[in-house]
Amino acid sequence: MVLLLLAGLLLPGQKEQPELQGKIFPAITNHLKIISTDGKSIDTIHEKAQKELAKVIAEQYQLGKELSIILVCTGNSRRSMMGAAMGNASAAYHGFSDLRFYSGGTTPSAFNSRSIRALKEIGFKIEPTGGKTKPGPKGEDNPFYQVSWLIDKGWNCIEFSKHYSDPKNPQKDFIALMVCDEADSACTVVMGAKKRIPVPFADPKAFDGKPEEAAKYSERRDDIGRFMLSTLAIAKEQLKSK
């Protein structure tokens, strides 16, 4: 039987952890607590995806074996980037030590500075490494960034805009979350994915350069974060019944 603690997982043969949650940067933990208790629910259009994702996580999660999820959108610039970051922080918050989130696109561009700002606003540490890869389709500079959410550096990652099939991402047996309608329509088959789940979120790009720009990026970050937190909470309850 899999036993669950409020702040994390306790699996057979595993001692009660210095909880993974305790390694998250405090500002991120505080923000996750706020959006998980603010009384807001996920959108109705996401409920089916939530049930589907929670079910597959509960069925396939195993301690010591990574379960990989790639968030896919067109440009791998905004929603997929923020979604992977919020997914990884949410996994740590709920104690899923072997659940990892990645990002990718169908037409990669660059990690948008507004997405970076929205994540840094709640405590993520995002710093350029000095390296970069090939530019986006419009000639955008595409630097590498170190993205950190945990004190333990081994859990953090290097992010850059890339095709979902980039060698830096899992190549097979991953779950694909299609977080934009365009990618969902253009990429009906995600090569290597064992499960493909559409869960579209509105693109904050529509507000670039407008007075509400920062607020809309923060809103989308929190919408995706709330989806991740509540989905993993459901998966924990389903694991509990095994």
What are these regions (language model features)?
Residues 16-242:
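Short polar/charged helix/loop
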Residues 4-5, 98:
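N-terminal low-hydrophobic presequence detector
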